[in-house]
Regions:
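Multi-pass membrane proteins that catalyze or facilitate reactions on polyprenyl-/lipid-phosphate substrates
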Residues: 1-264
Length: 264
């Protein structure tokens, strides 16, 4: 069972980490480890379900906070957009459904998470050197597939769905503001799908009242912290390079690997 106070802490961390390309999943893995919590003692299925629930709380906050932008995007939605959305969803859905549990078992620890942070940082640095030639309404099937592969890669903790999809869009030569818009647009189907899958699995095995309470507290904290952190989106949306976020990720990964080497 996840204690209520820890559920609150992780929910509060989720909001800012969700809105910046720094990997919220890495922070949900590393905060308990750095704080010395017995996080490894929690059932992996429960840990992942809790993490997905935090994403759901953040997504709900974004739906409210960004409702005007979402409404504008829906009005402009067409067949081409539907193809991009479908292709961006399918690779991650298939990989997640087939390999989610092995990923949780083998890539859910601090070391693998640190490597994920480094890999995502490298991808962001390389992609952000690409020219900004493409803008609104220019995304096609190949772009959707590239974003889908990126979202599948983001199933590994530390890679960051936000960061790697920004990198994929920038690699496809989209402008920074359009890359941000694409990254946010394709997020919702993945979050809804993951919530449905985890919710179904958790319902089948049964969830104790204590676990349901912890999940509800975490979701509420994630919702509140995301809603309060909406202005962080502006930091990424401005015409700025991704290197500050890549540098933060690399520094965090280095700190984790150094601590692991010391055996702390």
């Amino acid at each position: 069972v996840i204690p209520a106070r820890r559920a609150v802490v992780l929910g509060l961390v989720q909001g800012p980490a969700e809105l910046l390309p720094v990997s919220s999943s890495a922070h949900i893995v590393l905060v308990p480890w750095l704080a010395g919590w017995d996080w490894e003692g929690v059932d992996p299925e429960v840990r992942k379900s809790f993490e997905v629930a935090l994403h759901t709380g953040a997504a709900a906050a974004l739906l409210i906070g960004q409702r005007h932008l979402i409404a504008e995007e829906l009005r402009a939605f067409d067949l081409r957009g539907a193809v991009v959305l479908a292709l961006s969803f399918l690779p991650a859905a298939v990989v997640g459904y087939k390999f989610e549990r092995p990923i949780e078992r083998h890539l859910g620890g601090p070391r693998a998470t640190a490597y994920g942070l480094l890999a995502g940082a490298a991808a962001m640095l390389v992609a952000d050197t690409r020219p900004q030639l493409r803008g609104r309404g220019e995304a096609g099937a190949a772009d959707g597939l590239a974003l889908g592969v990126a979202q599948a890669a983001a199933l590994a903790p530390g890679v960051s769905r936000n960061g790697i999809t920004l990198a994929a869009a920038r690699w496809r030569r989209f402008s920074r503001d359009q890359a941000n818009l694409l990254s946010r647009t394709i997020a919702l189907p993945i979050i809804v799908g993951a919530t449905a899958l985890k919710g179904t699995r958790l319902a089948r095995r049964g969830a104790s009242p204590e676990l349901r309470r912890s999940v509800a507290i975490g979701v509420a904290a994630s919702f509140a912290s995301t809603l309060a952190s909406q202005r962080l989106i502006k930091l990424v949306e401005r015409d700025r390079a991704l290197w500050p976020y890549a540098a933060y990720r690399a520094a965090l990964a280095a700190a984790v690997l150094a601590r692991l080497r010391r055996g702390d």
